[in-house]
From Swiss-Prot:
Pathway: Protein modification; protein glycosylation. Keywords: Carbohydrate metabolism, Disulfide bond, Endoplasmic reticulum, Fucose metabolism, Glycoprotein, Glycosyltransferase, Manganese, Notch signaling pathway, Signal, Transferase. This is GDP-fucose protein O-fucosyltransferase 1. The keyword Phosphoprotein does not apply. Disulfide bonds join C35-C37, C119-C135, C249-C281, C266-C353. GO terms for molecular function: peptide-O-fucosyltransferase activity. It comes from Caenorhabditis elegans. Monomer. It catalyses: L-seryl-[protein] + GDP-beta-L-fucose = 3-O-(alpha-L-fucosyl)-L-seryl-[protein] + GDP + H(+); L-threonyl-[protein] + GDP-beta-L-fucose = 3-O-(alpha-L-fucosyl)-L-threonyl-[protein] + GDP + H(+). Its main location: endoplasmic reticulum. The gene is pfut-1.
């Protein structure tokens, strides 16, 4: 998946305008900076919603993270403003870009000798067995490269595991304890070794997705692809089918019915709406084809867009769609950010219930507009209600 190295002029002007308005200000309530170091983009965005809520509740400015791309053999850091509009997320809570923070705020507010890492509790180092227990915030990839990229090293650790609820500030007394233990006068920056938010995210933060609007670059690429390739109305589908994912789904236990990754997006909190099965997590090709054909027929779709981490099944889908005389399309080369934006604009979306990548699309479709846009999931059939007359 490719990422351009140059921001569009519109994005650049937007970021600069926002930064200039903030450049001479520092927040007396302090800052929060963190590494979105758990998993790939879907997981990172999932936790980011919780971090936004956490920063807002503590009344600190959030330093917008660099998102992490795992591209063998290197790890790439993608600035937040390259993907999303800074001004829109600032409508939810106070934020500052990583570049603004590191260049103009960090040197004075958070000098090198005061940089401490925050984690739940001390742990043993993985690679250096002789090291004392601690946060070890720069141990391994992507942790080390993430902090190195912004030129941060830590001189000590702070632990918050004794705070009731940890970073769940909804628990009684939690916010007060945070403010008492880590006052902004003594701790102007709370630097977390990982996201201070639960994973998977809870439904109470999903609506925050409406403040994450794609950058003008990504939006224009999505519009351009749709205009050139997708006749409307169109169905968009996300297929999660690489080998690692299949192995994850093999361990699903229907007797315990525990939530897995984003599964609560379709089965409800605690799975009170149903049971997670292997077929929902990793649907068969037959199941996928049947549901695509069903959804195409239900809205009279004129085209289908497919995003996938491995097998887009374009040939199989097109064969199944022959009676409708329409075709499926994909991006070549693939760009996951543009794919997400395209799926968000579809007339109907079919995703993977367990995938946090699919969940980005579902949340956007549920909350970005005045009313939710239709979405469905593979392996889950809509229940037809019987009405007695």
């Amino acid at each position: 998946m490719r990422v351009s190295k140059v921001l569009t002029l519109a994005s650049f002007i937007s970021v600069c305008s926002y930064s200039e308005a903030k450049s001479n200000e520092t927040d007396p309530n302090g800052y929060i900076v963190f590494c979105p170091c758990m998993g790939r983009f879907g997981n990172q965005v999932d936790q980011f919603l919780g971090v936004l809520a956490f920063a807002k509740a503590l009344d600190r400015t959030l330093v917008l993270p660099n998102f992490i791309e795992f591209k063998h053999p290197e790890t790439k850091m993608i600035p937040f403003e390259f993907l999303f509009q800074v001004g829109t997320v600032a409508k939810y809570t106070r934020v500052v870009t990583m570049q603004e923070f590191t260049k103009k705020i960090m040197p004075t507010v958070w000098p090198p000798e005061k940089r401490k890492a925050f984690c739940w509790t001390p742990r043993q180092a993985i690679y250096d067995k002789s090291a004392e227990p601690g946060c070890h915030s720069k141990e391994g990839n992507p942790f080390g490269p993430y902090w190195d990229q912004i030129d941060v090293s830590f001189v000590g650790d702070e632990y918050f595991g004794d705070i009731p609820g940890g970073f769940d500030l909804n628990q009684m007394g939690s916010r007060k304890k945070w403010l008492e233990k880590f006052p902004s006068e003594e701790y102007p920056v709370l630097a977390f070794s990982s996201a201070p938010a639960p994973f998977p995210s809870k439904g109470k933060v999903w609506s925050i997705q409406k403040y994450l609007r794609w950058s003008s670059r990504i939006t224009e690429q999505a519009k351009k692809f749709i205009s050139a390739n997708l006749a409307k109305p169109f169905v968009a589908v996300h297929l999660r089918n690489d080998a690692d994912w299949v192995r994850v789904c093999e361990h699903i236990d229907t007797t315990t019915n525990r939530p897995l990754f984003a599964s609560e997006q379709c089965l409800g909190e605690g799975h009170h709406l149903g049971t997670l099965t292997k077929e929902i997590c990793s649907p068969s090709k037959q199941q996928i084809l049947e549901q695509i054909v069903e959804k195409v027929g239900s809205i009279g779709a004129k085209s289908v867009f497919v995003a996938s981490d491995k097998d887009h099944m374009i040939d199989e889908i097109n064969e199944a769609l022959k009676p409708y005389e329409i075709e499926a399309h994909r991006q070549e080369p693939d760009d996951m950010y543009t794919s997400l934006a395209i799926m968000g604009r579809a007339d109907l979306f079919v995703g993977n219930c367990v995938s946090t990548f699919s969940h980005i699309v579902k949340r956007e479709r549920d909350h970005a507009g005045q009313s939710p846009r239709p979405s469905a999931f593979f392996g889950i059939r809509a229940v037809k209600r019987h009405i007695d007359l």
